[in-house]
Amino acid sequence: MLKIFNTLTKKKEIFKSIKCGEIKIYVCGITVYDLCHLGHARTFVIFDTILRYLKHYGYQVKYVRNITDIDDKIIQRAIKNNETTDHLASRMIQEMYLDLDILNILRPNYEPKVTDHIELIINFIRLLIERNHAYVTSDGNVMFSIQTVYNYGVLSCHKKNQTFTQRNIRNKMIKKDPVDFVLWKTAKSGEPYWISPWGKGRPGWHIECSAISHAFLGKHIDIHGGGSDLVFPHHENEIAQSTCAHHITVDSYVNTWIHTGMLTFNDEKMSKSLNNFFTIREIIQKYDPETIRYFLLSAHYRKPLRYSDNNIKNARLSLKHLYSALHGINFNPIVQLYDNNSEKYFISKFNNKMNNDFNFPEAYSILFEMAHALNIAKIKDHVRAKSLAAHLKYLANILGILYQDPEIYLGYNTCIKNNKQSLTVEKIRELIYMRENARKNKEWQLSDKIRKRLTEIGIILEDKPTGKTIWRYN
């Protein structure tokens, strides 16, 4: 029985989907003005793992994650870079895919961009105006009236006067009430804009998620999530917009709110605004992507996770332990899962840990129990060893790990020599990553040059439709 902590009710609840066997999930995506940082990675690795487990549990999952490709930050960065907002956003979206793919994060079913859905956002705003929850100001902005929402603050427990004190004290927009927030923002001279009933402008940040989630998932959503920093004001404002637009209750809008803990560095939240962040691109120059993924799941998803080199090195040691257990096993792809009572026992324990609010660290502990049993079986019972190894890889796949050849990960062939040149596995991965980036940017000459170099030293590349590349020794 799956239990999930619901941010709305502040307690663990037995999860029951709106429609039997199906789950609709909406997660707030990235504002694409810069490279993804490790805080983004933690949130998306967590929801990727939740998605994988729900599928393992038997659900059909419809997963939507939006892309904010127009925003004040995007406009400011485009001006700084002397490029258009379209070009900047498009470039950063491709970089985002490179970063998330390399962490073995599955693509959502839908990734709607805001600029592709301006009309439906305008219609959503129009509906709020018709129902007297929004108004047009003299300077052409459209504002949401928080005073029309009797239970504003239900998710975050913020009171309306706190909203003004903490968030809007510096906001110079014309409003009926200082706590009101913008739905449609009038474009300044030289800024990108779209034509609306209220003049030239662009959507506010909060309205895009209400409009897009409704368009793709309907009025009622099973799971809505994001980082804990989105609880207020973003998700609070989403609740206000969506419940007012559709005349629905808060708990019928979203069954379960899931929020991930922050990644911390020097006891502060890792974020771009504090300028204390590391990009995914920077981190994978030091550590392999699978180690990073393991690390990001090493604390309970609702708790803060402290970034340190020691913590990541410990994650790598843990992975090495698991890969060492798998080393030397000739995998039989037709091994039948669940065909042994012992393996059923491990799977049941794994499910119990994950059913308890997706307890990833406890789920890891089951993998180590299996690795211990596997090491014994490799000596005493080779048939059972193969079965245990297959089940270990199956459960690890739910966590998005142990997808590599153990020999490659452990470095038994870390050095390939050709014409007195050598490449470590880490260098091979780096070259493949560079080639993936070149292909994304249509730099075909560079892509071919990297492939040729790897081919010359006995590396075979296989490009997947997702854009990822798998490699092996010839």
Curated annotation (Swiss-Prot):
Signal peptide: none annotated. The keyword ATP-binding applies. It catalyses: tRNA(Cys) + L-cysteine + ATP = L-cysteinyl-tRNA(Cys) + AMP + diphosphate. A motif ('KMSKS' region) lies at residues 269-273. SUPFAM superfamilies: Anticodon-binding domain of a subclass of class I aminoacyl-tRNA synthetases (SSF47323), Nucleotidylyl transferase (SSF52374). Its main location: cytoplasm. SMART domains: DALR_2 (SM00840). Belongs to the class-I aminoacyl-tRNA synthetase family. This is Cysteine--tRNA ligase. The lineage of its organism: Bacteria, Pseudomonadati, Pseudomonadota, Gammaproteobacteria, Enterobacterales. The gene is cysS.
